[in-house]
Regions:
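Compositionally biased alpha-helical segments
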Residues: 1-29
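A composition-driven surface/loop motif
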Residues: 29-369
Length: 369
């Protein structure tokens, strides 16, 4: 700590104007190097920064709404650890270097915007601390894209649980790819005004548990970016874990939707719905189901609806699986029930290639290879 000419005070590399300081609190609380701890309570929030990263970070706290901006000169990964509860709080991070976000028993409901808003285009590793329960709810109004938004690419890990409630739009959204690692515990989408997960570039699930319910649009929607050279652009890749999507009574929606290839090589997928015109799985290109992960996948789809807007320009028929190009089935088990009028289990506009596995439903294909 340096006191200079009675006008400034420098602490841990940051200089403050004396006239702007109304109090100084000194305590013995340790903060791990490279870490920022944000502790919420209904009355507000407190931010604790490690000395090695404090010079590069600027924090703003208004009630329990916390915003932290990382300077361009930051060249180390910071771990932001959120804990505590607030019925009117949020967390926003802005920066340009990869970071870690640890949810360590945090419960936030925002009255203005997203509950968590990461305006950082780099890799964001989200860790659900083992044994913790976390919950996020955004405001019912505002311009936010999701309750939990990541501008860059998100990677989820950690054995805790996270419940998301999207009151304005999506429950979770990322501008670039999203991955669920094998160490993941459970992410539960309780409800969303639009999609449960809305992901740019690609979605990869290697393990853990993802449950999506109460959505008024698609369960998982993966959109290709505008850059055709982006890796796995528009794809879905599922090699493990348990994915459960309940579309409920929403009409003309999809459980799992992708702009490009969907590859399912492991895991257990269950999709249910009772609205009209629903699609359990919908790909704009090809579908590949095999056991390349070493464990054969199981797909169970039950859609009880019929045709949406029958006879209209936007008519949509119920389909368990709809493939715009080719479908290759080479391992696993597929069970589909679509008992409604005009509904079908699997429709393939291109070629259907059967190699191995158990499929307990009819396949309607333009060509059988």
């Amino acid at each position: 700590m340096t006191y200079d000419n009675g006008t400034t005070l420098t602490v841990a590399g940051r200089t403050y104007t004396i006239a702007d300081i109304d109090s100084i609190v000194v305590n013995s609380r340790p903060v791990t190097a490279g870490q920022v701890e944000v502790s919420y309570s209904n009355g507000g929030a407190r931010v604790f920064m490690a000395g090695d990263v404090a010079p590069y970070l600027t924090a703003s706290v208004s009630g329990a709404h916390v915003s932290i901006t990382a300077a361009a000169g930051l060249t180390q990964e910071v771990n932001y650890v959120l804990s505590g509860t607030s019925s009117d709080g949020s967390f926003t991070q802005t920066g340009s270097y990869k970071m870690r976000l640890t949810l360590q028993g945090v419960d936030l409901t925002s009255s203005s915007g997203a509950a968590i808003n990461v305006q950082n285009g780099k890799r964001i590793k989200v860790v659900l601390a083992d044994g913790t329960t976390n919950a996020l709810t955004d405001a019912a109004s505002g311009s936010q894209k999701a309750c939990f938004y990541v501008r860059g690419h998100a990677e989820f890990a950690g054995g805790g649980t996270l419940t998301l409630t999207g009151r304005k739009a999506h429950a979770f959204a990322s501008g670039e790819y999203t991955e669920l690692h094998s160490s993941l515990g459970h992410i539960y989408v309780a409800s969303a005004v639009t999609d449960g997960f809305h992901v740019g570039q690609y979605f990869r699930m290697a393990g853990g548990k993802l449950t999506i319910a109460g959505v008024k649009s698609d369960g998982i929607d993966v959109a290709a970016t505008n850059h055709s050279t982006d890796e796995n652009n528009g794809q879905v890749m599922i090699s493990g874990g348990t994915l459960t999507i309940a579309l409920d009574a929403a009409h003309d929606v999809k459980g799992l939707k992708a702009d490009s290839l969907i590859t399912i090589s492991g895991g257990n997928i269950t999709i249910t719905g009772m609205g009209n015109g629903q699609k359990g799985i919908k790909t704009a290109t090809n579908l590949l189901v095999n056991n390349a992960s070493g464990t054969a996948p199981t797909l169970t789809i039950t859609l009880t609806g019929t045709t949406y807007n029958k006879g209209q320009a936007d008519e949509s028929k119920t389909r368990g699986i709809k493939v715009d190009r080719d479908f290759t089935f080479d391992g696993g088990t597929i069970n589909i029930s679509t008992p409604g009028p005009k509904a079908k289990a699997i429709v393939v506009d291109g070629t259907y290639y059967y190699k191995s596995g158990t499929i307990n439903c009819p396949v309607s294909a333009a060509i059988v290879g």
